[in-house]
UniProtKB/Swiss-Prot annotation:
Homodimer. Zn(2+) 1 binds at H63, H65, H145, D216. Zinc phosphodiesterase, which displays some tRNA 3'-processing endonuclease activity. Probably involved in tRNA maturation, by removing a 3'-trailer from precursor tRNA. The keyword tRNA processing applies. Keywords: Endonuclease, Hydrolase, Metal-binding, Nuclease, tRNA processing, Zinc. The active site is at D67 (proton acceptor). HAMAP family: RNase_Z_BN (MF_01818). Pfam families: Lactamase_B (PF00753). Its EC number is 3.1.26.11. This is Ribonuclease Z.
Length: 309
């Protein structure tokens, strides 16, 4: 499971940072990639990665500001150009209005897609669990931005314990149907009368990962709820230390506010993105250092950077 950041800048493209987009790679888990936001130029950023557009089967939009959605029509169109590969449908989750934006953009440009788009639109009355599969849950809450904006909490369901095949072989259990019974938690009796207890050969269930990905937001209790005990929190850092007032006026957060949320929510790792273009490399190093005074395990991520979860 990995995060890869396609755009980590704020507002408009800059030389070092494109606008907002990131992907959650779940290739080992479910052979899918999930995208979060799709600012302009996202499809160009993908060309610099190993990501296959057809693997992107779910897109989660945080809000409808242009730097988070203007790349969506282009990405959906270029995804259709993979004629030699199997076409897969795509699901788009986001605020009310995302469906009309996408459909109007495609219609006006005369774009016809060889796959279906399934839209899931939400208002502030629809928050809570918004998606569930056999392996994952996704929750959403309203954040505190200048327009309706959502934050997402992706929860991997606990993983089943693994079967210790080598130990079973040593115990004289013949490979075959008996292995399956033990894996399903069923005790068995061998031909020689020995009882094999399933619990002795299956490891404890492994706790699933929790990844919280927030959109643009002021400091708000909703961020802390979404991030509670998360393995990774992706939080915006449009402004730096001492910029609390201007951040609040513009519906954004500072690096210090993000660090405080991470600390209060007991997250394991904080990744800061949505960085203003006015912050150069040396400024970002200082912002990271300042944030680390509140929450040690913090990093300001760069475009195309990958983080293993």
């Amino acid at each position: 499971m990995e995060l890869q950041f396609l755009g980590t800048g704020a507002g408009q493209p800059a030389k070092q940072r494109n606008v907002s987009s990131l992907v959650l790679k779940l290739l080992d888990e479910i052979n899918e990639v999930w995208m979060f936001d799709c600012g302009e130029g996202t499809q160009r950023q993908i060309l610099e990665t190993s990501i296959k557009p057809r693997k992107i089967q779910k897109i989660f939009i945080t809000h409808l500001h242009g730097d988070h959605i203007f790349g969506l029509p282009g990405f959906l169109s270029s995804r259709a150009f993979q004629a030699s590969e199997e076409q897969t449908d795509i699901e788009i989750f986001g605020p009310l209005g995302i469906k009309s934006f996408v459909q109007n953009s495609l219609a006006i440009s005369g774009t016809r897609l060889p796959y279906k788009i399934h839209f899931h639109e939400f208002t502030d009355k629809d928050m809570g669990k918004i998606m569930e599969t056999d392996k994952f849950l996704v929750y959403a809450e309203k954040l505190a931005h200048t327009i309706f904006c959502m934050g997402y909490r992706v929860v991997q369901k606990d993983l089943e314990g693994t079967l210790d095949a080598e130990a079973l072989k040593k115990a004289g259990v013949p490979f075959g149907p008996l292995f399956g019974k033990i894996k399903n938690g069923q005790d068995i009796v061998l031909d020689d009368g020995r009882q094999i207890l399933a619990k002795d050969y299956i490891s404890e269930p492994k706790k699933g990962k929790v990844i919280t990905i927030l959109g643009d937001t002021r400091k708000t209790p909703a961020s802390q709820r979404l991030a509670l005990n998360a393995d990774v929190l992706v939080h915006e850092s449009t402004y730096g230390k001492g910029d609390d007032r201007i951040a609040r006026n513009h519906g954004h957060s500072t690096n210090m506010q993000a660090a405080q949320i991470a600390k209060d929510a007991n997250v394991k790792r904080l990744l800061l993105n949505h960085v203003s273009a006015r912050f150069l490399s040396r400024d970002c190093r200082q912002m990271e250092k300042d944030a680390a005074s509140l929450f040690e395990n913090v990093k300001i991520v760069k475009d195309l950077e990958e983080v293993t979860i």
